Amino acid sequence: MAELSGPCGPGCIGSASFRGGLPLAIDPMPQSAQHRAMTLAITPSGQACGARVTGVDLTRPLAPGTIAAIRAAWLDHHVLAFPGQRMNADDLERFTSYFGGFGDDPFIRPIPGRDHIIAVQRKADETAPLFAENWHSDWSFQARPPAGTCLLGITIPPVGGNTEFSNQHAALDAMPAQLRARIEGLQAVHSARNGYAPTGMYGANDKGRSMDIRSDDEALEIRHHPFVRDHPETGREGLFGCAGYIIGFDGLDDSEGLPLLYELIQWQGREEFRYNHEWEPDMLVMWDNRSLLHRATGGYDGHDRLLHRTTIAAWGGA
């Protein structure tokens, strides 16, 4: 378990001190009592990514040093879980804003009275297909996809409903040379059409869903992103996106591109690259869309489930 506190001091790399790739404790600078840096306890999951963070109260404004320490841990572990956070909507929006402002959430109407919070929910008796059950990186079809996502557990079923994450740095590192040679230099074609176009999964024929999803022809637009790319903050190479929002590769016809996408998703979601996250009520989870794929799982029929979600805007380099 590592402990982090305070702002960056001498010997920093980025926003935290490192030795052997692991963040170390940082001595806090004098601050007011209200904004005094908190000491974070970070416990890695022991899986391919993910860590549990305690020693911080996210219902209070955070000191710059605490924010820097959380960001360093986020970049290192890719998924952070903060248990025991009885956050309201103001708290969730304030926390999100520390890490780059709000991303644009298309196709899903925000909760009443808020512009940046959407409800990820499912009623106990709902029969519509599970939302977001396939691997994806949130909104990868945008020109500037969000850097991260924050998800706050409000009503959590007693069974099921885990979220799985897959580390795409690890997936690239372990990829066989022959497969890697086939993807070098490829531009992936991203689109929301399979999900959010009027003919898509969440389109006109999607009935009985409690989430407020609004399909639109805007989902037919396409964007190109490198399939192998450097993380904009850490510089580490990884895979970005997967079949679903990726509908092909520029320069490859479907007879070649679609079988390659299928082969890749089998690789990208392998067990050894995964972290299986178990939810708790009042738990906030933040993850890095630039490093990961994720997907929802079911297993909680007969139970309500409600989480509030924000997205962190693409990193501006500051």
For the regions a protein language model found, what residue spans apply to each?
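Extreme N-terminal basic, low-complexity initiation segments
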Residues: M1-P7
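Short hydrophobic transmembrane-like helices used for membrane targeting/insertion
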Residues: M1, I13, I26-M29
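Leucine-biased recognition of intrinsically disordered, low-complexity hydrophobic segments
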Residues: L4, L22-L24
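Non-heme Fe(II) oxygenase catalytic core, chiefly the N-lobe of the double-stranded beta-helix
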Residues: A25-L284, R290-A318
